[in-house]
Curated annotation (Swiss-Prot):
Protein name: Ribosome maturation factor RimP
Transmembrane residue ranges: none
GO process terms (BP): ribosomal small subunit assembly; translation
Gene of this entry: rimP
Keywords: Cytoplasm, Ribosome biogenesis
Xref: CDD domains: YlxS_C (cd01734)
Role description: Required for maturation of 30S ribosomal subunits.
Biological classification of the source: Bacteria, Pseudomonadati, Pseudomonadota, Betaproteobacteria, Neisseriales
Length: 143
């Protein structure tokens, strides 16, 4: 099995959502997890211990395993992410331009039929999930 398949099969059984993962330089495997209510250090330790054993059995090669929350600017990958975070601001980069534009910063209005609706500068744009190259939440800080 590949890393993504292992993570997608293992994490939900432990009560966590796979947000993203990356195999970085020098063999560091970073896994970003989430759950309702947020992630604690204990959650990261639990997942790390469990995945270490699973990866050993599956003979997945890596030097270091890092488990982390996705952070305030978490990536948005699936339709469910855009539904969950409707009403929040995001930065979205598309693969192909829409109206001559590839970068959008605005409020997520929702996601239906694999199409994300974003409002910005008094306009609304619809972006197909397949056209999204990168999307991240853009947290607002109020002082």
């Amino acid at each position: 099995m590949d890393i993504q398949t292992i993570l997608e099969k293992t994490l939900p059984g432990l009560g966590y959502e796979l947000v993203d993962f990356e195999l970085a330089a020098q063999g560091t495997l970073r896994v970003f997890i989430d759950k309702e209510g947020g992630i604690t250090v204990e959650d990261c330790a639990t997942v790390s211990n469990h995945l270490s054993r699973v990866f050993m059995v599956e003979d997945i090669g890596y030097k270091n395993l890092e488990i982390s929350s996705p952070g305030l600017d978490r990536p948005l990958k699936k339709a469910a992410d855009f539904v969950r975070f409707a009403g929040q601001n995001a930065k979205i980069k598309t693969r192909l331009p829409i109206g001559g534009q590839k970068n959008f910063i605005g409020k997520i209005e929702g996601c239906e039929n694999d199409t994300v609706t974003v409002s910005f500068d008094g306009k609304t744009v619809q972006i197909e999930l397949g056209n999204i190259d990168k999307a991240r939440l853009r947290p607002e800080f109020k002082f």
